[in-house]
């Protein structure tokens, strides 16, 4: 039905929901531990192409209530672009209750509270967010592009607008040497923010990522 651009990733919780690729790849794509989008160049898909896919899916699944916007960090899209998409989705799926996507600290902090509130009012009510670690030392080593304070600020900004957060931290990302640092500093982030769902991931590096990992 839909000609996806692979590889395609989605959170486990979105397994039974509609997935629509509004971007391809990841706008940052520099994390040393992540190989998910290394084969893709970041691209914003044309609205008319996305609309055609939404219309096709709506005809087949008119009772859809949940939609996940792929790829890596769709919140990188300008707010006006996202708002246009959200309004189109609401017209296509009259029973739509929730739209979700991956987001980073950079994405969130690039938007004002008013912009995020408007997106939330138009059904963007859940973001999936990779904290990875709270350690500034490890964040720098894995080239995450943000520090602990950025993570705390972005999570609290999103939470203040009513957007729910499903966050993940990575077990083992500090290795043996930085294990305590990883635990203690990550706990600081969790205690300083309002995360609705928290999960852990086990560190696993593909061969191409091992060469660049600290």
Indicate residue ranges for each PLM-predicted region.
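Conserved C-terminal portion of the radical SAM core fold
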Residues: 126, 149-211
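Short glycine-enriched, charge-decorated loop/helix-capping segments at active-site entrances
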Residues: 36-41, 140-146, 214
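Active-site mouth loops of central-metabolism enzymes
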Residues: 41-44, 102-109, 174-181
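Short, acidic/polar
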Residues: 50-51, 110-118, 180-188
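Conserved SAM/AdoMet-binding glycine-rich loop
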Residues: 58-160
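Conserved, mostly hydrophobic/aromatic
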Residues: 26, 34, 50, 69, ...
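Short microdomains enriched in Cys/His and/or Lys/Arg
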Residues: 46-63, 214
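Canonical Radical SAM [4Fe-4S] cluster-binding loop centered on the CxxxCxxC motif
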Residues: 5-49
């Amino acid at each position: 039905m839909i000609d996806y651009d692979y590889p395609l990733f989605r959170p486990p919780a979105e397994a039974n929901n509609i997935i629509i690729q509004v971007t391809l790849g990841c706008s940052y794509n520099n994390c040393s531990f992540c190989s998910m989008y290394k084969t893709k160049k970041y691209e914003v898909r044309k609205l008319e192409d996305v609309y055609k896919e939404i219309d096709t899916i709506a005809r087949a699944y008119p009772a859809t209530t949940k939609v996940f916007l792929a790829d890596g960090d769709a919140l990188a899209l300008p707010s006006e672009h996202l708002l246009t998409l959200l309004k189109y989705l609401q017209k296509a799926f009259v029973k739509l209750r929730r739209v979700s996507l991956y987001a980073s600290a950079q994405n969130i902090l690039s938007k004002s509270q008013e912009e995020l509130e408007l997106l939330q009012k138009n059904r963007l009510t859940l973001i999936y967010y990779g904290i990875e670690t709270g350690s500034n030392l490890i964040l720098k080593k894995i080239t995450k592009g943000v520090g602990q304070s950025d993570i705390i600020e972005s999570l609290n900004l999103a939470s203040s607008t009513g957007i729910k957060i499903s966050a993940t931290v990575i077990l083992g990302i500090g290795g043996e040497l930085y294990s305590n640092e990883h635990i203690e500093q990550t706990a600081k982030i969790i205690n300083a923010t309002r995360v609705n769902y928290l999960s852990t991931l086990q560190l696993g590096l593909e061969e191409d990522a091992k060469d660049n990992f600290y």
